[in-house]
Amino acid sequence: MSTTRTDRVACGNAGDMDLHIWTPDQRPKAAVLLIQEIFGVGPYIRAVAERLAVAGYLVGAPDVFWRFAPHWEAGHDPAGLGASMEKVGQLDFPAAVGDVTAALAHLAGQPGIEIAPAVLGFCLGGTLAWAVAANAEPSVCVSYYGSGVPDMLGMIDQVTCPTLFHFGSEDAFIANAGVDAIGAAIAGREGFVLNVEQAGHAFDNHESAMFHNEAAAKAAWAKTMAFLGLYLPA
């Protein structure tokens, strides 16, 4: 189990963003910035955060849509998907990268944290994790099915941390050609890993019957925890 709180992170003149914090029972020395999917910081993201906290990590999950839809949460069903896609259309992506980078710095400054936190994101958060890794210095980047990543490979030389990508071979939202481009771009780069599961988009999301693939989720999560354990032990 963990204890939870909500911190406020200054984001320039725009105001303050909520950063939900999970603290493990034992004093943490490593942290993970967990970046939401389009459905918000809802039951699924909170469950992932708790899983990471049980593993010993301090976890922070920023409220990415705070500038126009604070505390956004949507159902993990077709109606929620449609509503969430509308919210994504309102997102100022560069501003969101700045906000998440500020959250990373805040998490890095918490007591006991010895080195830079990891960034771990799902869907929209997978794209943001990659962008933040290119603009800041996290210890590790784990990106789950970030649909924007194939179009952002030009920033790969800016990413200096070990990076693990997860995609599904049957993802209707991300072309296999884009995933292949990632594989080609990271070939020969130490610490960069591409994992492709036989699954569709958002396969880790246990809250969504239309997306979840239990076998793929378990396999990818085992790889994620091994990757974190190698480069950022709790």
PLM regions with names:
Residues M1-A234:
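N-terminal cap/leader regions of alpha/beta-hydrolase-fold enzymes
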